[in-house]
């Protein structure tokens, strides 16, 4: 307490158990500071993406780790989309194999699995899904969207049409099949001379609600690791906040059972519902190596998020789920896009 009687909030939060007594006596939420910090971040940033044009030394570096006989803390899935030939496959190969492919082979459906370790020692099994940007694969591409955690939407800096297609084609598609999933806008081939203004890229990033805009070159390895380090750091930070919330929720339920339950009964009501909450663990899903069908799902409706407990910290800067007009069946989106195409008879 301060001399004038007001409460001073400590910067050290402590564990939920160590705060039980003070919480019950004063009604102070042990994670109130975390909530306020998240709200302040959202208010200050809004829809403004993090723009990375040069190398950013402040992004944590995730080092390669071995998957052999090792249990990871998290499973993460990244799906890469964009126009055909814009550099999606080269970006993935440059990251996973540390080399630039000399021969271009159009991708149909590929996925790569690797493991990385964060600076705080936690490991992440990272599944990278490559997709085909050509129109003939419009019906196959949605098979890669189930369980995606972050989307990389790519465009080539030397091709203005690929940037326009981000707004006109790729964002509507991913927003239909996986609404609310965070998007990172990636400008590839930054080693090539280009007259494209960065302002246009920033404007598109804001319009689609991207959490970041990163310029990279797979040929020179410029910012290649930065793209994935940025995605990994964003994913891990949100997962740790979710774990923190679930710990607080579990602590409150234990107190409720000791006091006889929130409904004044024996506490069976709380025990029953505590089993229904999803926890952040490796059983959330598994990524199978060298297969394209391990996450295949029925596409009769747009994908929704897992049945996690609603997070009081907000949506971490994502756009709210927008009702899609293409929810009749799985191929309504493709048919609608083809109807809009103009046919010119010469």
Swiss-Prot record:
Propeptide position ranges: 344-346
GO molecular function annotation: GTP binding; GTPase activity
GO cellular component assignments: plasma membrane
Binding site for GTP: 82-89, 130-134, 188-191
Cysteine methyl ester modified-residue sites: 343
InterPro entries: P-loop_NTPase (IPR027417), Small_GTP-bd (IPR005225), Small_GTPase (IPR001806), Small_GTPase_Rho (IPR003578)
UniProt KW keywords: Cell membrane, GTP-binding, Lipoprotein, Membrane, Methylation, Nucleotide-binding, Prenylation
Motif (Effector region): 104-112
Lipidation (S-geranylgeranyl cysteine): 343
Database matches in PANTHER family: RHO FAMILY GTPASE
Protein name per Swiss-Prot or TrEMBL: GTP-binding RHO-like protein
Origin species: Candida albicans (strain WO-1)
Gene (name only): CRL1
């Amino acid at each position: 307490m301060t001399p004038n009687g007001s409460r001073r909030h400590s910067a050290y939060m402590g564990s939920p158990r160590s705060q039980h007594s003070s919480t019950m006596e004063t009604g102070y939420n042990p994670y109130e500071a975390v909530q306020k910090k998240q709200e302040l971040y959202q208010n200050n940033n809004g829809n403004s993406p993090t723009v990375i044009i040069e190398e950013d030394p402040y992004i944590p570096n995730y080092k390669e780790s071995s998957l052999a006989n090792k249990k990871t803390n998290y499973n993460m899935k990244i799906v890469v989309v964009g126009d055909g030939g814009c550099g999606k496959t080269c970006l993935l190969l440059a990251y996973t194999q540390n080399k630039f492919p000399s021969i271009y082979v159009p991708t149909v459906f590929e996925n790569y699995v690797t493991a990385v370790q964060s600076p705080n020692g936690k490991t992440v099994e990272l599944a990278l899904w490559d997709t085909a940007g050509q129109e003939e694969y419009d019906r196959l591409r949605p098979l890669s969207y189930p369980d995606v955690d972050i989307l990389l939407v790519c465009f080539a800096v030397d091709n203005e049409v690929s940037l326009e297609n981000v707004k006109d084609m790729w964002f509507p598609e991913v927003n239909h099949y996986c609404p609310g999933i965070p998007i990172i806008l990636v400008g590839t081939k930054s080693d090539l001379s280009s007259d494209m203004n960065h302002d246009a890229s920033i404007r598109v990033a804001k319009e689609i609600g991207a959490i970041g805009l990163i310029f990279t070159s797979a040929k020179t390895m410029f910012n290649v690791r930065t793209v994935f380090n940025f995605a990994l750091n964003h994913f891990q930070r949100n997962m740790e906040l979710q774990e923190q919330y679930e710990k607080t929720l579990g602590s409150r339920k234990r107190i409720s059972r000791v006091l006889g339950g929130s409904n004044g009964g024996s506490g069976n009501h709380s025990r029953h519902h505590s089993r229904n909450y999803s926890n952040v663990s490796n059983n959330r899903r598994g990524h199978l190596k060298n297969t394209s069908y391990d996450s295949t799902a029925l596409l009769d409706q747009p994908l929704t998020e897992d049945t996690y407990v609603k997070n009081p910290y907000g949506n971490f800067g994502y756009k709210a789920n927008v009702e899609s007009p293409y929810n009749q069946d799985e191929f309504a989106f493709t048919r609608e896009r083809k109807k809009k195409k103009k046919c010119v008879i010469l």
